Amino acid sequence: DPPKAMTDRLEEVSRLGPHQYPITMGAPNFRQALSRKCERFMGMKYDPETELVVTIGSTEAMVDTIFALTNPGDKIVMFSPYFENYRAQTIMAGCEPVFVPLVPPAFGFDPEVLEDAFRQHPKAILICNPSNPSGKVFTYDELKLIADLCIRYDVYAIMDEVYEHIVYEGHKHTYMSTLPGMRERTVCCSSLSKTYSVTGWRLGYALAPQNIMDRIKQYHDFNTVGAPSPLMEAAVVGLDMPMSYYEEFGAHYAHMKALFTGGMKELGIPFTDPQGTYFVLADISPFLKKGQSDVDFCVEMAQKIGVGAVPGSSFFDEDVNHIIRLHFAKKDETLTDALNRLESLREKIPARG
């Protein structure tokens, strides 16, 4: 659930307003609060007047950024597996995606394969960190390697950092824009959706130097006009939450992760242990019938045991048919019920033999 302070404020705003169009780039008090929050965690200031725009979720921020930085025919590097919207957004802009595989279980990448992609003279690299769907948190050294390539080949970095506060013990989120030479060529796209449990509020944003932000704002203006003014007003209190909120938030997700992955281990279902986010990639190889697709398996699983999953083929450029994505951002009773249902998987969807 969202923080009570935000829902209480939303109730007040529903009576008192604002209810009219905000300024296109976002309400001033919301942008100022967002700038303060980003400075607190990133250690660098983004000017709320010239380097920040409020969007309809991070999805719009990504679309606006891709259109602002590229021309039709340009190439964009992205890692596979990837959030499925990225490919569509890239193609929609008339660009060509260039995929670099992340290799499970740790989802590392081959530096030489990555540089081969940069040798194709892309306009940008698009990175989700922490990563949906793999749960990978890129290390400082990995980001430094990518940053060095961006500088050497004059490439922009488009960062999707919506899971920045869902990182588990032993891992640390590093903002690409904080690396040497990267602030001037990085666009950070994020949202309030995950951090404050308000996915339906659709409050996102982009951070970028002014020369890039001026172009992003133009696309934003003609795409959506502006974010909802009542929701921005209600969310200001959330952006000023004390550090204790983020500590409790992280502990809560660590609890959900332990509950769900612990149950998966007991059931003997192979999966990758996420370093961040709330996703688990499970290996369904033992359950696939000959010729059955992961899509068909997900339909069968939903029908026979009542657990929903996303087919892994949605996220890979490679021919991958044996992985599904599950998520654990649910209440304990829901996760326990899902695990109880998954316990009947071998009975209701017998392993191939």
For the regions a language model picked out, list residue spans one by one:
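N-terminal small-domain helix-loop-helix segment of the aminotransferase-like
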Residues: D1-G57, D64, D240-M241, K348-G353
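PLP-dependent enzyme catalytic core of the Aspartate aminotransferase-like
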Residues: D116, K290-G291, E300-A309, F315-G353
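PLP-dependent aminotransferase class I/II
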Residues: D1-P3, R185-G276
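Active-site phosphate-binding strand-loop segment of PLP-dependent enzymes
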Residues: L102-E169
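Conserved PLP-binding catalytic core of the aspartate aminotransferase-like
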Residues: Y253-A254, L267-K304
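Conserved PLP-anchoring active-site segment centered on the Schiff-base-forming lysine
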Residues: A68-T90
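A short helix-loop-beta submotif of the ANL/AMP-binding
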Residues: M92-V98
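Helix C-cap/helix->beta junction micro-motif
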Residues: A93, R152-Y153, L267, I305, ...
